[in-house]
From Swiss-Prot:
Designated name of the protein: Glutamate-1-semialdehyde 2,1-aminomutase
Cofactor(s) listed in the protein's UniProt record: pyridoxal 5'-phosphate
Keyword Isomerase: yes
Family: Belongs to the class-III pyridoxal-phosphate-dependent aminotransferase family. HemL subfamily.
Gene Ontology MF, one: transaminase activity
InterPro entries hit by this protein: 4pyrrol_synth_GluAld_NH2Trfase (IPR004639), Aminotrans_3 (IPR005814), Aminotrans_3_PPA_site (IPR049704), PyrdxlP-dep_Trfase (IPR015424), PyrdxlP-dep_Trfase_major (IPR015421), PyrdxlP-dep_Trfase_small (IPR015422)
Pfam families for this protein: Aminotran_3
Subunit structure: Homodimer.
Enzyme class: isomerase
Protein's UniProt keywords contain Transmembrane helix: no
Superkingdom: Bacteria
């Protein structure tokens, strides 16, 4: 029995499902989850010491690769001064200045501890600012596990087959309207049904929680126009795309100006950090200068701020995003070519440092229904064949893959070669 199997058996006795986040349990692919002992660069090492080329990247934060020296040294230095103060620090001011510089739509920013906190707080702020209750989200998009957002959700909720979670009262979600991603007509219909009741739209600019589904050219600008027409706020959830798709996030890549932005993952450099921010007029409604309450004991934690600052400073260096894009394109093109050579129908989507693999006969994947029509069983087979070759992909057909600048072209070619092997086995 491997150490991962032993640890998993022990974990299931004291942790529900043996994991602290459902998608880690391998329910989406079957088998025993890997228990990771350490990581460095583009590689993770399991409890038995086996190395895997990693395309999960802790679900997105590790854009520089694992255990980056700049982040490690920043954290080590910060720890010497204390772990938490519960008071303002220079580091959080420096972080706020850097974030607002990199993301021009954010005049002001508030630090929190997770992406869920960021989206939950941004929606509360939008409701407080507009005086309206209803919100619009999209099928297959995931914005954390706040009650009002677990409606036709993606990510682990979709992997577990529970996009609508038990335990969420109907009264909590009656104000949540769900539209079809990449379908502006469905959004207009929602506004026309409730013309003066919708506080905001919240959207993943690239839907990364139903694998990787980019927006159509008119989708994000269309959402902006509809919000302006009906007096609602546009919240762009950049927890996954922020500082990854482009330095200024997907909003810079697609040239759209949101009222509020939610950040997470990369902003913490691997530490638990989230943030939300936006136009000063809206952010000024937050306590202590406004009536909308939001707080957090560990928000702006000095260790987390040190990690996040170091990460953003490195990500801001010239060439980082060009490298990410080149590596991701090389991988996507190589995987698609090998699939076609093997006669296996597949669609590969990619934007910046994100990619998604879909086993489908369709020519494109642009919405939740397209994703649900893909062959999940074939993905499971592909996942385990790649794992056999020590390539670690997300253990779910509904999660995006992530590139880092620590990946080399040799790593990419090794992955393509492994896929060729996997496709040959799948064809047989």
């Amino acid at each position: 029995m491997s150490k991962s199997e032993t640890l998993y058996n022990l974990a299931q006795q004291v942790i529900p499902g043996g994991v602290n986040s459902p998608v880690r349990a391998f329910n989406g692919v079957g088998g025993t989850p890997l228990f990771i002992e350490r990581a460095n660069g583009a590689y993770i090492y399991d409890a038995d010491g086996r190395a895997y080329l990693d395309y999960v990247g802790s679900w997105g934060p590790m854009v520089l690769g694992h255990n980056h020296p700049a982040i490690r040294h920043a954290v080590t230095d910060a720890v010497q001064k204390g772990l938490s103060f519960g008071a303002p620090t220079a580091a959080e001011v420096e972080m706020a200045n850097l974030v607002t510089e990199l993301v021009p739509s954010m005049d002001m920013v508030r630090m929190v501890n997770s992406g869920t906190e960021a989206t939950m707080s941004a929606i509360r702020l939008a409701r407080g600012y507009t005086g309206r209750d209803k919100i619009i989200k999209f099928e297959g998009c995931y914005h954390g596990h706040a009650d009002c957002l677990l409606v036709k959700a993606g990510s682990g909720a979709l992997t577990m087959g529970q996009p609508n979670s038990p335990g969420v009262p109907a009264d909590f979600v009656k104000h949540t309207l769900t539209c079809t991603y990449n379908d502006l007509n469905s959004v207009r219909q929602a506004f026309e049904n409730y013309p003066e009741e919708i506080a905001c739209i919240i959207v993943e600019p690239v839907a990364g929680n139903m694998n990787c589904v980019p927006p159509k050219a008119d989708f994000l600008p269309g959402l902006r126009a509809l919000c302006d027409e009906f007096g609602a706020l546009l919240i762009i959830d950049e927890v996954m795309t922020g500082f990854r798709v482009a330095l200024g996030g997907a909003q810079a890549y697609y040239d759209v100006d949101p009222d509020l932005t939610c950040l997470g993952k990369i902003i913490g450099g691997g530490m638990p950090v989230g943030a939300f921010g936006g136009h000063k007029e809206v952010m000024s409604q937050l306590a202590p200068i406004g009536p909308v309450y939001q707080a957090g004991t560990l928000s702006g934690n000095p260790i987390a701020m040190a990690a996040g600052l170091a990460c953003l400073q490195e990500v801001s260096q010239p060439g980082v995003h060009q490298t990410l894009d080149e590596l991701t394109t090389m991988l996507a093109d190589g995987l698609l070519e090998k699939a076609q050579q093997a006669g296996i129908p597949m669609v590969v989507n990619h934007v910046g440092g994100m990619f998604g693999l879909f086993f489908t006969d369709a020519k494109e994947v642009t919405c939740y229904q397209d994703v649900m029509n893909c062959d999940v069983e074939r993905f499971k087979q592909f996942f385990h064949l790649m794992l056999e070759k020590r390539i670690y992909l997300a253990p779910s057909a509904f999660e995006a893959g992530f590139m880092s600048i620590a990946h080399s072209k040799e790593d990419i070619q090794r992955t393509i070669d492994a896929a060729e092997y996997a496709f040959s086995k799948m064809k047989a």
